[in-house]
Amino acid sequence: LTCFNDFSPTAHTVEDCQRGITTCYMKTWRVHRETVIERGCGCPKVKPGIRLKCCTGNTCNY
């Protein structure tokens, strides 16, 4: 599985996930009126106030 793995609004870099990982994620949250975006492999638990989207399929976390 290949997922985007960067911290910007436009996804540019990718990573090959470790064997056995079947999902990609995109987390978003607000900091001082700006939206922060984090992408990567897996589907992590998040704190309240953080939006999480998990998906299956190569580069689905755009």
Swiss-Prot record:
Is the keyword Disulfide bond in the record? yes
Where does it localize? Secreted
Single annotated GO MF: ion channel regulator activity
Q: Chief localization class? A: secreted
Read off the InterPro entries from this record.
Snake_3FTx (IPR003571), Snake_toxin-like_sf (IPR045860), Snake_toxin_con_site (IPR018354), Toxin_cobra-type (IPR054131)
A Pfam family recorded for this sequence: Toxin_cobra-type
Does the keyword Ribonucleoprotein feature in the UniProt annotation? no
Q: What GO cellular-component annotations does this UniProt entry give?
A: extracellular region
> What is this protein's tissue specificity according to the annotation?
Expressed by the venom gland.
**Cystine bridges: which residues?**
3-24, 17-41, 43-54, 55-60
What CDD domains does the annotation carry? TFP_snake_toxin (cd00206)
Query: Sorted alphabetically, which keywords does the UniProt record give?
Result: Acetylcholine receptor inhibiting toxin, Disulfide bond, Ion channel impairing toxin, Neurotoxin, Postsynaptic neurotoxin, Secreted, Toxin
Q: Which family does it belong to?
A: Belongs to the three-finger toxin family. Short-chain subfamily. Type I alpha-neurotoxin sub-subfamily.
**According to its UniProt entry, what is the function of this protein?**
Binds to muscle nicotinic acetylcholine receptor (nAChR) and inhibit acetylcholine from binding to the receptor, thereby impairing neuromuscular transmission.
Q: What is this protein called?
A: Frontoxin III
